[in-house]
């Protein structure tokens, strides 16, 4: 492995290896290339079959210990492409008993410049389709269930962290279910952009030194091998030069991360206490929260997810910078973009896989506590504003703030009992309309 040995000397040695899924994708590309080249009569059958078999072994992870180049290498990804070529060539030579050359045979009809951009797109698309979206669907289902379970649990609304009109807990959780549905639509749309791959573009997108039918044949084989709806890129020049589709996917990841961060922050606030915080929900935990304070239970899974979400947001900046690397015919941020985007997908998938069963499915509303807080909120006075006016309502609100009971303050202000009853019907206050102007009561 002459190239790989030299590469280890000149590339960085940070210990940052390519994700398993990218190596899987590279192995399948080499498999598809060998099969396509044989079908087009460009390579003898014995070598082609040996390369195909060795390539599948690489895809399956049997030679991961030999894929040793660092992510921080040449911007085209030539280092990892040649590392894989040399591993396959060595193994194919053993299988066939013939000399199999890493460039002449394994890399036939290819360049690092079309192979690695294709591999990182295939890897990311696969992870989104097969891992991230199912995990996200589980979170959405859990939020739907939680919203349904708490649809009649009234609690105080809060804006600016100050008392506001009452809402139901179900309304709050339904907001996040809807947000995740919209984020899912964005993620699904953007990841499908990755399915256009530049395989066959060779060095600069023209396809020089590749059979004219090679892209079609190779991508067809890859489509079957990966189970993804892959297509030859509408412009190989674009897909080799720009990483805009990966930037779009990372942006969708960022939206997911931000929505997740907000959900977790709200859960932490609602769980705060038990005696000096909101204490509106309980989340049974199975691990001690403090090494010093006995019996203290902290929202450990929630905080782990928030840290992962923060990392996803930060990694989006790396994707942005990686997309700017390069000039003219080729991006120079391909290895970094591949590594970082897969990392984002893994962080989100693992977060969702833990958030649904360990947090959302375990949330228990503290119904009486939440209702008590809602009934004692001075913001309830807002209901009377359409009748008594904003200024008079503000005076009553001030009296409540200074310690008077709501009912007492209303009576002293001359509010009729029927309006007081409407004001204190907090279930009604979580629905649209103008209760103070409604007949009856």
Question: Model-derived features: where do they sit?
Answer:
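Conserved, well-structured ligand/cofactor-binding cores
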Residues: 2-441
């Amino acid at each position: 492995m002459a190239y790989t040995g030299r590469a280890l000397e000149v590339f960085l040695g940070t210990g940052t290896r390519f994700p398993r899924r990218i190596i899987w994708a590279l192995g399948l590309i080499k498999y598809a290339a060998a099969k396509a080249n044989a079908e087009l009569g460009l390579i003898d059958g014995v070598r082609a079959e040996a390369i195909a078999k060795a390539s599948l072994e690489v895809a399956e992870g049997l030679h991961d210990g030999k894929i040793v180049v660092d992510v921080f290498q040449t911007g085209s990804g030539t280092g990892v492409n040649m590392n894989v070529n040399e591993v396959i060539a060595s193994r194919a030579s053993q299988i066939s008993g013939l000399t199999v050359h890493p460039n002449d045979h394994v890399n036939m009809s290819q360049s690092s410049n079309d192979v690695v951009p294709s591999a990182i797109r295939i890897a990311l698309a696969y992870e989104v389709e097969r891992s991230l979206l199912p995990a996200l669907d589980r979170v959405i289902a859990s939020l739907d269930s939680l919203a349904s379970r708490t649809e009649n649990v009234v609690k105080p609304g809060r804006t600016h962290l100050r008392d506001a009109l009452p809402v139901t807990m179900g309304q709050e959780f339904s907001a996040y279910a809807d947000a995740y549905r919209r984020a899912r639509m964005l993620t699904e749309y953007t990841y499908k952009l990755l399915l256009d791959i530049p395989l066959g573009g060779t060095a600069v997108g023209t396809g020089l030194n590749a059979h004219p039918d090679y892209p079609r044949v190779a991508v067809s084989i890859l489509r079957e091998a990966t189970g993804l709806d892959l297509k030859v890129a509408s412009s190989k020049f674009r897909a080799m030069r720009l990483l805009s589709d990966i930037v779009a996917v990372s942006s969708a990841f960022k939206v997911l991360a931000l929505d997740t961060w907000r959900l977790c922050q709200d859960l932490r606030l609602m769980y705060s206490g038990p005696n000096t915080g909101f204490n509106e929900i309980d989340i049974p935990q199975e691990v001690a929260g403090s090494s010093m304070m006995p019996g203290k239970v902290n929202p450990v899974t929630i905080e782990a997810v928030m840290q992962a979400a923060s990392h996803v947001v930060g990694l989006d900046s790396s994707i942005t910078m990686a997309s700017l690397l390069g000039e003219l015919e080729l991006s120079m941020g391909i290895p970094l973009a591949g590594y970082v985007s897969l990392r984002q997908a893994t962080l989100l998938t693992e977060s969702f896989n833990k958030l649904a069963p360990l947090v959302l499915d375990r949330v228990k509303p503290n119904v009486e506590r939440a209702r008590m807080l809602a009934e004692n909120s001075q913001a309830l006075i807002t209901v009377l504003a359409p009748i008594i006016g904003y200024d008079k309502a503000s005076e009553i609100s001030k009296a409540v703030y200074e310690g008077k009971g709501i009912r007492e303050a209303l009576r002293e202000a001359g509010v009729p009992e029927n309006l007081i009853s409407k004001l204190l019907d907090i279930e009604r206050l979580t629905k649209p309309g103008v209760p103070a102007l409604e007949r009856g009561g």
